[in-house]
Amino acid sequence: MHNVEDDMKNVVCIKWGEKYSAEYVNRLYGMVQRQLSLPHRFVCLTEDSTGIDSVIETLPLIRTDLKHSYTKLQLFLNPLHDIQGQILFLDLDTVILNSIDDLFLHKPEAKFIGLHEWFDDFLGSSTFRFEAGQFPFVLEEWDKSVKNRFTEEHIFDAATKETNLQYHDLNSFPPEVYRGDQEWITKALRDR
């Protein structure tokens, strides 16, 4: 009989740019170690491992051309370095207060599990679980769309005083706007 607890479990985070320091990676690692009792591998994908605790496995970002939250789309590469089995992705600002074992044990046969945003009709991308290598079309379709259909627009958000990158699909009417990775991942999964 197959025991799901024997399957490879990976917890992956991504650190890019300067928004979150290495300390966020170190804290997330500590919370995962305290709250995940299943055997697992913790990996941080990053372009700069400075300050990340030496016990944390770091691997380089593969697609440095992906910007802002779209950096997450490289999680769907096949292969994603040597990572195999289930991947639980966690944003660096995630706070873990209780056991996260069930994030791996709930519906182990499911190829993708994500949390639905309560205020929008798409999946949240701060926490989701999927099988490594099973969804390369998420990034492949993104690459095709960016090259052939999208225009970029930088929008200033007065509330955060940040400039955000948005992509407009010029082939849809009205033009669809992808404000971040969450909307694109949801669209790609729904289209399949």
Residue spans of the language-model regions?
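Glycosyltransferase catalytic domains, chiefly GT-A lineage
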Residues: 2-192
